[in-house]
Regions:
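Substrate/cofactor-recognition hotspot
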Residues: 306-552
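Secondary-structure transition/capping motifs at alpha-helix termini
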Residues: 16-19, 48-56, 82-89, 217, ...
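Conserved short loop/turn motifs at secondary-structure junctions
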Residues: 28-32, 60-68, 91-100, 123-124, ...
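A glycine-rich helix N-cap at a beta->alpha junction
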Residues: 73-100, 105-106, 113-116
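Intrinsically disordered or highly flexible coil/loop and linker segments, enriched in small
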Residues: 20, 115, 163, 180, ...
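Active-site cores that bind ATP or allylic diphosphates and position pyrophosphate for catalysis
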Residues: 63-65, 71, 108-270, 328, ...
Length: 552
């Protein structure tokens, strides 16, 4: 079923009025950082709407600020869109493709008396513009320069005759407007920095609010959909479109950005976490970046499901991270094959089982009925096994249903065993658990009909694969990182237990050839994926269960 929301209602009305025939959208990230889960919402909205209406979707790299952008980010953005399945059928473009056109249109505004070169510094300009709290604006002493003088100065700006900040091109709009964005905004500034695509061809660069509507219009974008913080920029967007192109389209429309609990979305904060070594790069599995989520084991489909379930509205809200976890958990419960992994191993010896014998039990790859997976795999069983430390208790607590001295449990898919005795290390910890097996129970229940309540998982010691397992959790302890007290340091809220590393884990041998793209449920433990950077390391995608119930 097609998604319906306030944006599609706007589009339906525009189509009904015959103003447009084909929907054309775009996603215009600045290549100065890696995309994150919030970016996925903007991608989904623009891509899905174009897809829903049989239109076109562009990717435009908004590389109008040469000081902060680079090919590393360009490549990562393109890779992320491809991974999400949101390939731009309208094409891939760069903001810098339109520098010549932006310059041409700036000269047009100058000649029409709608733009002027200002000598005020940035601080002086801020002072002269006043404030939206009632402080009136004042015209710059250079506001009434003639078009001829402004054109000469602007061309000299381009020729590199002035220092950074010495001259600025401003649009001449309305100094009395209550909207600060219309009080003669800067539309070109001097910047001496090598551009990643244009080199040193330019030393003046268009401001975002000027370049963006021009880029949209040139590409034939019909609906420029962006997050809510640009709502009060819309009158400036419209001014540029009307005064340069004389049309009503493109139309800018805004939606609420995606905010999620226990994380930060600010590129500045994310960059600090990387540069300070607090996380292991932009793709650290604790990061909200798409590459981090991908390395963690999230799928593109689970991310788009999350975005869709979070909804599209004009009201800011905070989405519980557990809703994202619920999306991937539901998906992997159906798609992930089951494997056995012992994360905190202790040796179990079946004393009445031959030391030189190996047999194989058929164990289901995915017992979830909805998965419709009837396949099995063979799991080796030998005299010496590994089980979880927590599955044995010498002095069991109340309602403990796992292994105890004198007690019985079912080894998952295998025999019922009874603990006869234990060996201990010098520090008192358990070294070896000695058991006997009821060798008649390999394919069913005991002949005498006795009930065994507990079932535990295990791995053959002779066939086990050694691995490191990383148990990831939320990066910050505070749910709403946008509401921390003013003046406090966001790093004070870092979760010291955001990752717990388990070394010496024992995995079943079927995992020896696992690839980073593979996803598994480690039975009774959680969902895991091989790390893409470190062979022999597994990342926990998400726990097996949570009390969170997503809204229907």
């Amino acid at each position: 079923m097609a998604d319906k929301n306030f944006l599609t209602e706007i589009i339906d009305a525009d189509l009904a009025e015959g103003q447009i025939r084909e929907i054309h959208t775009r996603f215009p990230p600045e290549p100065n950082g890696y995309l994150h889960i919030g970016s996925a919402k903007a991608i989904y909205i623009n891509w899905s709407i174009a897809n829903q209406y049989g239109g076109k979707f562009n990717l435009r790299l908004d590389d109008t600020n040469p000081a902060r952008e680079g090919e590393e980010y360009v490549n990562s953005i393109i890779e992320d869109l491809h991974w999400l399945g949101a390939d731009p059928n309208g094409g891939i473009f760069y903001g810098s493709d339109y520098f010549d056109k932006c310059y041409e249109y700036a000269e047009k505004l100058i000649l029409e008396g709608k733009a002027y070169v200002d000598d005020l510094t940035r601080d002086e300009m801020r002072e002269y513009r006043g404030s939206d709290a009632g402080k009136p604006s004042r015209p710059s002493p250079w506001r009434d320069r003639t078009p001829e003088e402004n054109l000469d100065l602007f061309r000299r700006m381009r020729a590199g005759e002035f220092k950074e900040g010495e001259k600025t091109l401003r649009a001449k709009i309305d100094l009395a407007s209550p909207n600060m964005n219309l009080r003669d905004p800067a539309i070109y500034r001097i910047k001496y920095a090598e551009h990643h695509r244009q080199g040193n061809k330019w030393c003046i660069y268009p401001m975002y609010d000027f370049a963006h509507p021009i880029q949209d219009a040139i590409e034939g974008i019909t609906h420029s959909m962006c997050s809510l913080e640009f709502e009060n920029h819309r009158p400036l967007y419209n001014w540029v479109i009307e005064n340069i192109f004389g049309t009503e389209f493109p139309k800018q429309r805004e939606f609420a950005r995606l905010n999620m609990t226990n994380t930060v979305m600010s590129k500045r904060y994310l960059r600090e976490l990387v540069e300070m070594g607090i996380v292991d790069g932009w793709d650290d599995p604790r990061m909200p970046t798409l590459c981090g989520l991908r390395r963690r084991g999230y799928t593109a489909s689970s991310i788009f499901t999350f975005v869709r379930e979070a909804g599209i509205s004009k009201s800011d809200n905070l989405i519980d991270m557990r809703q994202l976890e619920a999306c991937i958990r539901s998906e992997l419960d159906l798609t992930a094959q089951r494997r056995i992994a012992v994360l905190d191993p202790v040796k179990l010896v079946v004393d009445n089982y031959p030391a030189d014998k190996t047999e194989y039990f058929d164990i289901a790859n995915n017992p979830n009925r909805e998965a419709n997976d009837t396949t099995t795999r063979k799991v080796a069983f030998t005299r010496e096994l590994w089980i979880e430390n927590e599955d044995f208790a010498e002095v069991p607590p109340p309602k403990f249903k796992r292994l105890t001295v004198g007690g019985e449990v079912r080894l998952m898919g295998g025999y019922i065993v009874k603990c006869e005795s234990v060996e201990k290390n010098p520090d008192g910890s358990i070294a070896v658990i000695h058991c006997t097996a009821d060798l008649e129970t390999g394919n069913g229940n005991p002949a005498d009909g006795r009930k065994v309540k507990g079932t535990i998982h295990w791995v053959s010691a002779a066939h086990a694969v050694d691995a490191e397992v990383r148990l990831y959790d939320k990066l910050f302890t505070e749910a709403n990182m946008n509401a921390i007290p003013e003046g406090s340091d966001y790093k004070d809220y870092l979760n010291p237990d955001s990752v717990v590393v388990r070394k010496g884990c024992k995995l079943e041998e079927a995992l020896a050839d696992a690839k980073p793209s593979d996803k598994f449920q480690f039975v009774r433990t959680g969902f895991f994926t091989p790390d893409s950077k470190n062979p022999g390391v597994y990342n926990r995608v998400v726990t097996l269960r949570d009390s969170f119930k997503p809204a229907k």
